[in-house]
Regions:
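Alpha-helical solenoid scaffolds in eukaryotic macromolecular assemblies
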Residues: 1-75
Length: 75
């Protein structure tokens, strides 16, 4: 079955096709990723840090998502 994608995410993806540096569009995708399991969110984080490789803020979001899942399963 096809996976449901919220309309706001579709619009954000379209904006990024036109301008891959659109921070408003990235913010929508980041918020969506933060509400997903890491195995689904990882692709978004990978794209984010590939687009902004020198952004410590974005790397921190990615690392925190990975560490949070590690901590969750450690208990």
């Amino acid at each position: 079955a096809a996976e449901y994608v919220p309309e706001k995410v579709k619009k954000a993806e379209k904006k990024l096709e036109d301008n891959p540096y659109d921070l408003d569009a990235w913010s929508i995708l980041i918020r969506e990723a933060q509400n997903q399991p890491i195995d689904k969110a990882r692709k978004t984080y990978e794209r984010l840090v590939a687009q902004f490789p020198s952004s410590g803020r974005f790397w921190k979001l990615y690392v925190e998502a990975e560490v949070n899942i590690f901590i969750f399963f450690s208990y």
